[in-house]
Amino acid sequence: MFQPPTTKNADPDAPTRATDNDAAIARLSTVRKGYLADPYIAPLIPRAHLQQPRPPLINIGTYLRTRAVDLLLDDWFRLAGRQKVQIVSLGAGSDTRFWRLAVRFIFNTFFFVG
């Protein structure tokens, strides 16, 4: 559980950022253990070289979730053929999927909304 804010100035986005950070570190661990290839994750994590590996269950779960979404997107792109497609990624945080897809596909237009 998250601790209640201790001051009136507590950052209301802190729990969201903490969740994103935890997911990014789990992804880094999964990459370092050889489950996934992702050259973009380490630069997104402060002091990545100091991060400890996550337990095997976290690595396997991160791998399965990533592969499932990647396979769905691959099928979707294949079925679309040369038609224009649109991806709306809500709450992507430090997800590197855009960069990993951009290496394989040509994006004519993209928008980032922070």
Model-assigned labels for residue ranges:
Residues M1-G114:
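Rossmann-like AdoMet
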